[in-house]
């Protein structure tokens, strides 16, 4: 009898422990009006030197798997057909994740910002004949960043886009 009481007590204790651990979980933050274009940057360093990423321009590489920081370094060091493919990918990355793109580019020196903005805007105006995604993204970004380094990059993009679209 005593043995059954021991096991019953153990079982009851385990059940109470499990039930107590399964309380209602509430989110740590509320998600009100979360922008669908919200992204989380994942770059590990800010460098635009192709050699920092082991980039060589010996043959055409598949740039789809390049993270944004490596792609930007690739574009800034490339010329000819290498640059064309790189800036095409850079435009696609902007459309996919405009906030991440702008945040990363805003960390770079002004000269490199200008190059990346110019070629990305040119791709939007020339190659893609503005599929409206670019313009809509710029509108959203201008509302989200009304000052700071990101605003400078967005203004640069808008200016380059308007010049290219003429």
PLM regions: where:
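Bacterial N-terminal signal peptides that target proteins for export
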Residues: 1-8
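C-terminal motif of bacterial Sec signal peptides marking the signal peptidase cleavage site
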Residues: 17-20
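Non-catalytic all-alpha helical scaffold/repeat segments
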Residues: 25-166
């Amino acid at each position: 009898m005593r043995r059954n009481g021991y096991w019953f007590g153990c079982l009851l204790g385990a059940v109470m422990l499990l039930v107590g651990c399964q309380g209602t979980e509430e989110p740590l933050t509320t998600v009100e009006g979360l922008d669908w274009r919200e992204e989380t940057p994942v770059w590990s360093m800010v460098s635009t030197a192709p050699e920092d990423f082991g980039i060589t321009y010996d043959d055409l590489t598949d740039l789809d798997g390049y993270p944004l920081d490596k792609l930007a370094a690739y574009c800034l060091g490339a010329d000819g057909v290498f640059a064309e493919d790189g800036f095409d990918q850079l435009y696609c990355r902007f459309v996919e994740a405009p906030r991440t793109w702008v945040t990363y580019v805003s960390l770079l020196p002004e000269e490199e910002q200008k190059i990346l903005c110019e070629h990305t805007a040119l791709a939007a105006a020339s190659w893609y004949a503005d599929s409206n995604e670019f313009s809509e993204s710029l509108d959203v970004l201008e509302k989200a960043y009304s000052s700071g380094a990101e605003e400078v990059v967005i203004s640069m993009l808008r200016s380059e886009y308007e010049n290219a679209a003429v």
